[in-house]
Amino acid sequence: MAPSLDSISHSFANGVASAKQAVNGASTNLAVAGSHLPTTQVTQVDIVEKMLAAPTDSTLELDGYSLNLGDVVSAARKGRPVRVKDSDEIRSKIDKSVEFLRSQLSMSVYGVTTGFGGSADTRTEDAISLQKALLEHQLCGVLPSSFDSFRLGRGLENSLPLEVVRGAMTIRVNSLTRGHSAVRLVVLEALTNFLNHGITPIVPLRGTISASGDLSPLSYIAAAISGHPDSKVHVVHEGKEKILYAREAMALFNLEPVVLGPKEGLGLVNGTAVSASMATLALHDAHMLSLLSQSLTAMTVEAMVGHAGSFHPFLHDVTRPHPTQIEVAGNIRKLLEGSRFAVHHEEEVKVKDDEGILRQDRYPLRTSPQWLGPLVSDLIHAHAVLTIEAGQSTTDNPLIDVENKTSHHGGNFQAAAVANTMEKTRLGLAQIGKLNFTQLTEMLNAGMNRGLPSCLAAEDPSLSYHCKGLDIAAAAYTSELGHLANPVTTHVQPAEMANQAVNSLALISARRTTESNDVLSLLLATHLYCVLQAIDLRAIEFEFKKQFGPAIVSLIDQHFGSAMTGSNLRDELVEKVNKTLAKRLEQTNSYDLVPRWHDAFSFAAGTVVEVLSSTSLSLAAVNAWKVAAAESAISLTRQVRETFWSAASTSSPALSYLSPRTQILYAFVREELGVKARRGDVFLGKQEVTIGSNVSKIYEAIKSGRINNVLLKMLA
């Protein structure tokens, strides 16, 4: 048995989530090191691993109790075959509910012998015609009035995505399989036949308030399987996508329309399946975006030469043991293991030794587990809620208790549980976006990015503004995410003769959440593009430093060796010159190459004069050293750059600096997607593929799910 939602919420409130019993059917005990707080906590990685492991080719058997969200996604997006489980118990429950309803046809039964909603004061003995009347008034959505729009490649902008309709059909069959709804097995098989033959009803995008379930959208599904003459469907036949009337599509596959019996129209349309389907798909994508956000955070730490200590277990497991904060910190810590960019251990220094150096990373990196942890908690909770809603719930009305031979009039169709998960998820998406946006802008800002070139220009910044446009675009995406985060559920209007005076607006909220996923995908694709460029530029910097360290010593010996004879000034001079150069170079990363190095050594010359003031040093020697050192640095920089770019065409030298796990994402983008680091059109003297086209490749990999297993491999 799955735990109740109350028990899940209670365990979350105590930092001990039992949601895994609803999601995985099992528990994992995680001892929190040093905190003395044993927890039973499903992790987000567990959830994603299970979702992505859902098969796509084996038949999904629906029994009303075991459907999980990965199954819904595989049926909705991958066309996984679906059927009602071949079980005597299931057939018996369904048959008994139908028989019980038939025994009540002389009684006043809502939606069987009465009218609907605020019209439930009407009565009829024509139960079959009543179901037709139900569909008639609910088939009221706006779709193209002719096939011309479809032929011109338009017409679907006001219809639900086909994957949402397929997911809704899967969830609805699963719910009706429970035998609480008096809908015959032949009707369920009509739905699975549509799914398995790739016949998908065209359903209006708008027009439901998700109160008595999603009445109008589900009516279009019911109309299609019953062969309504004006019902349109999408089908793939002989390798071609077509929009046909439902009867035409059924004829292609020798399918017969079903005639809906008493309550069967109501049993099909009165439920939360459409909202639950769109919410499930939105949540699946939100999980993936959350993992991508964590991965980008780790890679930004690397690009910014940030501190792995921000994710130390003492900070999270011991001193603030929120389970999802622990998880996020652990994920990022794992991603940084073995990185040569990230600072893993920092020696304590005296007050004056690191003057002018930022002592710790800024909030977007340092507090990312504390920021993302609560959002991950909301996603895990939403997963538990939707697992119950899609896999273990009957959501129409009235419901039949076969064992006790009674019917119950209630409101399981009120989709507030779904709506609330979407409200929280959408708010979380905006907060994820805000975090990644601030990480991105810090990385692009020459005054904050620890010496990376302005706008991540690979060559002279005066003629390359590489990521400046992306900076602006990212601000637009983040602003839109903030707007979309506004609540939907506060905009309820009384409807249907004020009978549905409160309504969940779950599908509208799920639609807005799907939009947020899309916008966040754009933002994270932008971030990923930029962080890889930053990593490449940081690798060039590190390669340069390896070679320039000995060169500095050699130049100092060459120009000042005689002045330092018999003294202990050499080591002091080398150390102070290096510090002066590092500090000045970080302040001048918007300069072009040549003036930047001449400026840096002009500052370093002052350090030379200061250290060697007690010697016989001449100003001519200092000036000669200054010019020679600057020219040497300029020459070496160009040499290192050329070596890097030549090697990057095969296997980038940056890989050796990244952690083994972040190497996976770097290689996926650079090699599999073919998005290369950019030197600049002006420098190369030709116009290359646009920046936007390269970001688009990453965006498409996110939207298609191509990146999903890459992220799981990184975090497994």
UniProtKB/Swiss-Prot annotation:
- GO molecular function term, any single one: phenylalanine ammonia-lyase activity
Q: Which GO terms describe its cellular component?
A: cytoplasm
Q: Gene3D superfamilies given for it?
A: Fumarase/aspartase (Central domain), Fumarase/aspartase (N-terminal domain), Phenylalanine ammonia-lyase 1, domain 3
**What does its PTM field state?**
Contains an active site 4-methylidene-imidazol-5-one (MIO), which is formed autocatalytically by cyclization and dehydration of residues Ala-Ser-Gly.
InterPro entries reported in the protein's UniProt record:
Aromatic_Lyase, Fumarase/histidase_N, L-Aspartase-like, Phe/His_NH3-lyase_AS, Phe_NH3-lyase, Phe_NH3-lyase_shielding_dom_sf
Q: Which UniProt keywords apply?
A: Cytoplasm, Lyase, Phenylalanine catabolism, Phenylpropanoid metabolism
Q: Which residues form the active site?
A: Y110 (proton donor/acceptor)
* Complex formation: Homotetramer. Dimer of dimers.
Official protein name in the record: Phenylalanine/tyrosine ammonia-lyase
- Protein source organism: Rhodotorula toruloides (Yeast)
The gene behind this protein is PAL
